[in-house]
């Protein structure tokens, strides 16, 4: 095994692919723990368990999720079986160091191949990999967790053996799943595949875009990004602009889904870092102007994705803002009107086209739209009149 090897976990939620988590393992600091996790990802160690040919995390579920703390998986005794009761999942585990004799003779515990602690350090950063245990020293097997926040109460109690290097947004997606009172996800969150990772394999992502086109090197969630500080409003504005332009490049390629993800991401950065006017008035205005552009872009890309209700929503967000330039208001009315038209809400479409004309009277295209919708409305009225006359004839 190479120094600090890389492994991956592909995640699905209710059988829908979400994305890939890539982890770097600390072989030198935690050699035995790393070997165990590496092999369980590779899935090439024969299993001492009756119902499994090889020990593997593949098919294993995340059985405990605590927001602002951690996500936990790795019970390959109960957590990989679809018919296991929720009360059983989380009570088992099996490391690569277990053998058939131990499994056969141990009829009290469902945790096999327990091994010693290593690298009992401090959990000061999110996305740290740690081994779950039985609440006492040297009881590691296969269960592991990924922190989503600093966890000082775990310091010195759990082996630290790696960190997430790619796919942090996938971890956040799991963290944000709805859970019951015991932290059990209401959805079926599973490791659909796993193994040893190489750069040529990429980092698939299905609910966001990690395409770096246009220079977008920023994390999906602003809190996870380390390129600038919380009060560096200039850098934050630059990042939000770069992300927006990345979306526009994708839009021009007609990659509407990923363009939407980029615009949504840019909006998240704007909402996270926009200063109050009394803190930095100039930057506040710049952020607001960028937010207007993002609302317009979101309305347009969602229209192209045939998500008309969402397109209407973002156009409305813009129209509810203060001091919106007439040209931008015209664009918002036009795009919202187009969405209303697609939904056959003709009266609302006509009203928005009229408002658009008021804000941009020189636009000849909008005049054609108004005539077209008026004609549709008259045709519908004529059909209604004919139907009524048939009813009484």
Curated annotation (Swiss-Prot):
Start and end residues of the TPR repeats are: 240-273, 292-325, 330-363
User: Is Zinc among this UniProt entry's keywords?
Assistant: no
The GO terms this record gives for MF are:
cyclosporin A binding; peptidyl-prolyl cis-trans isomerase activity; unfolded protein binding
PPIase cyclophilin-type domain residues are 8-196
Q: Which PROSITE patterns does this chain map to? A: CSA_PPIASE_1 (PS00170), CSA_PPIASE_2 (PS50072), TPR (PS50005), TPR_REGION (PS50293)
Any one biological process term the GO annotation gives: protein folding
The EC category is isomerase
GO cellular component, as recorded = cytoplasm; cytosol
Catalytic activity as recorded in UniProt: [protein]-peptidylproline (omega=180) = [protein]-peptidylproline (omega=0)
- Could you say which EC number(s) this protein's record lists? 5.2.1.8
Keyword terms:
Isomerase, Repeat, Rotamase, TPR repeat
Q: How does it assemble?
A: Interacts with RPD3 and CNS1.
Known function:
PPIases accelerate the folding of proteins. It catalyzes the cis-trans isomerization of proline imidic peptide bonds in oligopeptides. Plays a major role in negative regulation of the heat shock transcription factor (HSF).
**Listed name of the protein:** Peptidyl-prolyl cis-trans isomerase CYP7
Q: Which organism is it from?
A: Saccharomyces cerevisiae (strain ATCC 204508 / S288c)
